[in-house]
Amino acid sequence: MTTKKLYFLSISIIILVAISIAIHITLNSNTKTRLTNDSQQQIDTIIEHDLQKGHIPGASILIVKNGKVFLNKGYGYQDVDKKVKASPTTKYEIASNTKAFTGLAILKLAQEGRLNLNDAVSKHVPHFKMNYNGQNETITIKQLLAQTSGIPSDITSEDAVTNKNNRLNDVTRAIMGDELHHKPGEEFEYSNMNYDLLGLIIQNVTKQSYTQYITDHWLKPLQMKHTTFKQTNYKSKHDAIGYELQGSTPVVSKPEFNLWDTPSAYMMTSTEDLEHWIKFQLNPPDKYKSLVQQSHKNLSSTIGEPNANAYASGWFTNNDEHLVFHSGTLDNFSSFILLNPKQNYGIVVLANLNSEYVPKLVEHLNTQIVNHKRYSTVASILNQYKDQFNIVTVLMTTLILLAFIFSAYRAWQMRHGQILLRRSKRIAVLSWLTLCLCIAIALILYALPYLILGSNNWSFVLTWLPIEIKLALITTLIALFSTLIVILLFLHTKITKT
């Protein structure tokens, strides 16, 4: 390779690297944040302690506050035998946290005028009827939402898994005429069947399957691209393996399940996807604001339920602490989602074991992060030095301009025959050393998030850096590469003697 070609190759590589880094930084919006190492270690200690106490194989945990992701991280293993670590993309069965999607879908259909919350269930499910004290009773959609229909919580326990009754329509026929525990509207009794019936109403009103309607009208618009519904016990690449404890040892568990229970229990999702759901719940777009607020509104009193005053549309509520939340439990999975719309934060814990330590962990995180401890973020610390970063930006911009002027002048001199390219082995060696320096700098930059923060990569870090730091970083990188270009120009050119 000639010196001239090497020179132009060096310049091209440097320019391309600088431009690509600048574009990548600019295109990332400030939607996430990152806890400092000390804060991260404190959070990790709390999480790992509770997971260990509960013998939980793996969990993924999400914390969102003020529209930013404070934490989205996996702990332990999604598959213990294969040593596959849990991550934000690991999908778990979220059990009863499916109900909030079902409830919101019903409210949206009511808003559109396609049903009325005071409609009798039998209006949309013609064959449906149930009795109280031997007399037929009318149950409304609102009573299903509020869990006050009187339908027993164990109504399907004697026929838990059958092929015959494995569809929504079939199971409602199977319980038709059964006895209610309470007169509709009088008492709260939590029953999955309430939300399974709501799923059937969604199907009958929209003429779509429940899963297809939720996917088309909620999951896709919310960019929850990897969220699905359980169809079999087969596990794909990103699906967590469910476990049950035998003594203190988690063992793989694949219990049978009912497809008709999908609207109340069988969504499969990750903290990566739930980030969109949590942000939507806390800060909904204007056209959905009233709908989301309605879904958090109390519908029934829940006397006897721990930490809850009332039940809303797929959520428990605690008015004293302004909390909206729900737990989810299956034989081999558990989940907990907690929202505080007033203080604008949300916590999600997904685990591949049914464990009482999941709600305990959420409680600990809620107490530690919000009420007592002041956890610092990298962004909050960097924000204290905005003025200094602005000065760096000005200085680096000046250096870039000087480098540009010098390079342009050198190009003009070359065009008019006032400079020549140097040709020597020493120059070639220096050029290769310059290229090696560029590569070394690129590798250091690539590893910088890990060296400073202990994990994460640029794609994550660049989403939460304050704009002042982004500008300082962009200009510093371009100034660095511009300086290398100037060095190359000095190495490769000399002024002709007149």
Swiss-Prot record:
<feature type="transmembrane region" description="Helical">
    <location>
        <begin position="6"/>
        <end position="26"/>
    </location>
</feature>
<dbReference type="Pfam" id="PF00144">
    <property type="entry name" value="Beta-lactamase"/>
</dbReference>
<feature type="transmembrane region" description="Helical">
    <location>
        <begin position="471"/>
        <end position="491"/>
    </location>
</feature>
<protein>
    <recommendedName>
        <fullName>Protein flp</fullName>
    </recommendedName>
</protein>
<keyword id="KW-1003">Cell membrane</keyword>
<keyword id="KW-0812">Transmembrane</keyword>
<comment type="function">
    <text>Its precise function is unknown. Has no penicillin-binding activity and is not involved in methicillin resistance.</text>
</comment>
<dbReference type="InterPro" id="IPR001466">
    <property type="entry name" value="Beta-lactam-related"/>
</dbReference>
<feature type="transmembrane region" description="Helical">
    <location>
        <begin position="389"/>
        <end position="409"/>
    </location>
</feature>
<dbReference type="GO" id="GO:0005886">
    <property type="term" value="C:plasma membrane"/>
</dbReference>
<dbReference type="InterPro" id="IPR050491">
    <property type="entry name" value="Bact_CellWall_Synth/Modif"/>
</dbReference>
<keyword id="KW-0472">Membrane</keyword>
<keyword id="KW-1133">Transmembrane helix</keyword>
<dbReference type="InterPro" id="IPR012338">
    <property type="entry name" value="Beta-lactam/transpept-like"/>
</dbReference>
<feature type="transmembrane region" description="Helical">
    <location>
        <begin position="433"/>
        <end position="453"/>
    </location>
</feature>
